[in-house]
């Protein structure tokens, strides 16, 4: 379900409201990006070859890394794999290995709450952007596969998830990354999920992910209503995503993957009412799908980094209601 940081998420905001209303949660408009910073132009022009693991560092020019040869993974996953130093606080490992596709051009969408959004190319290279409040080292995919393939039955990871981004190569590279994994690691030992990019996908793409070994297909709706989706993920922030296309692909996944093998991510506290988010949860249940809920927390560098985190009371009410629904 996700969690909140109690010290920074009071039960109510400064005005005494115990929810984030729509009129307060207005993203900033994206600014213009200098021509020489667009589409990873300077990274590709310098063409610095990568050398093994790349740890995000905004003080240097990022190497020219791209999927399917390279993927990014969270600090927690990198620590668990043993490819970077550090210890997990109050937990020895993370159980899901999330692999994020990566390119010098970065994600071409511009979602208001996301640290990977296109507008950030004005300030930092794609490989150096924070996402979900942590860094994501870039690692050769073959290295990840080789480490996990040594003993998948006893791996700390219980699942692997490929996270797509909005990029012209995203579909084919997802297939390639998935094949690299399943060629050496039995999906029965470590099942595979796809966190999809519906904007550029077709039904055939959805079918191919299943044919290659994925057993769960998820769509990151994130916003609970069409209006909120458009405001934070669509034309409101000069981004290409459309609510209808996301639903179309999710319904294709329903047909292809079957009950409880498809679903959606939902972020609570971006301006929706509690009725609206729970109505979405109910729709997913009625379809035979699942929901993954997260509470909004402002991501540094995003177009919503000035807005309040989800009040604790709102988050707990929605969590409890979802529990009763599902």
Task: For each feature predicted by the language model, list its residue ranges.
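Intrinsic-disorder-associated, low-complexity terminal segments enriched in Asp/Asn/His/Tyr and depleted
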Residues: 6, 14, 18-20, 36, ...
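N-terminal [4Fe-4S]-dependent radical SAM core
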Residues: 28, 40-110, 115-135, 147
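N-terminal intrinsically disordered, low-complexity tails
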Residues: 10-31
